[in-house]
């Protein structure tokens, strides 16, 4: 083949990955097409999904909040995973991925969901996690009242203690995101009328986080404009891409929104949006950040 122009050779009608190619650098060598595709990270149908995602999805929260995978990440948060979260790169972590710890699947529901929020800004990169099913059942209050709002409820004061301990045991205290959250702490005529800033780790989610909008929580009616005491104004990205994860068939679950003088919002076990009297016992399916 010496001194034969490559353009004078016949053109191949088909190409296989086992075909041999001539490579010329410091020396003349040969390589299969499959080797070239692999070494140059060229996306092709035979590429493993994880490899393809690493090539196609850029590092950072924006792209990862738009990519669903649903992979089991193992039985613990590894040092490599923690490093990716801390750096805000989130490589090999995607929506719907989950850690299976102590019989609970903790789903990744969003990346940097609370970043820069709060009266004191949240500056740590993090993933928002939520258990696939409720952890246990409890009432919002002993009686049918929403007095004091979510921050004044029995659920907020003591009912989440078990959830906080469960997530701390699963991920370690050093990896639980501590941030600032605005919460309703007073109610007038069945509508939130006051709020304040609180240190926050593990909370009940809100209607906004589940659905992307208020459904039963009070909203502007042309006469009154209720204040939304929250920084959680956007839907968790997981539920936008895979809404089947927004509810659990095992139980209806509490949300933190005040609906009336007697009821808080909930997510139905059939996927519906609803509300229930504060003394009713429903599922506790909390959300928190891992950093």
Descriptions of predicted regions:
Residues 17-25, 106:
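Extracellular disulfide-bonded cysteine-rich modules/repeats
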Residues 40-61:
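Heptad-repeat coiled-coil amphipathic alpha-helices that mediate oligomerization/assembly
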